Amino acid sequence: MIKSIINEKNIYNADVVLVSAGYDKTASSHKGTKDGPKKVVQHLHNQVEFWSRKYKKNTNDFVKTAHKDLGNLNKLNPEAVLKKIRTTCDQLIEKNKFIFILGGEHSVSIGHFQALVGKYKPKDVTIVQIDAHCDLRKDDSDYSDNPTNLAHSTVMRHASSLGYPIVQV
């Protein structure tokens, strides 16, 4: 019986890499999203249905999935967080891996968006955002004593400025 969707230890042998980016330093309200990746991964070990009706077999039979945890990102400043995420994504994209970023707050996506620009034309990639907020702010100066233009509330502004078409739901 398959117990986990994470079925490959070596990220370079995997088809899909789940990248845990637990970070919530620029969250505007309650903190705790930094713990999201850990909780998601815990449930992926025993709460996922693997059977594919289309292929009539378990997806784990033909998709290798690995996990990379970037550690405690809250100890870093926003620029260092995005650099770490971008560097990780650059390395994985170079090896043609499909990347899932498990955040943390929305700003962790910026590093991934930046890495994708190196491989794909932004106009050929559409970013679909499902959120109650547009996240198009210039910075977080209206709710932070230490404002940054890399806050979670700026993520879609960054996507748009990189040239990505965005669809907001």
Residue map of PLM features:
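Conserved alpha-helical scaffold segments that buttress catalytic/binding sites
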Residues: 1-169
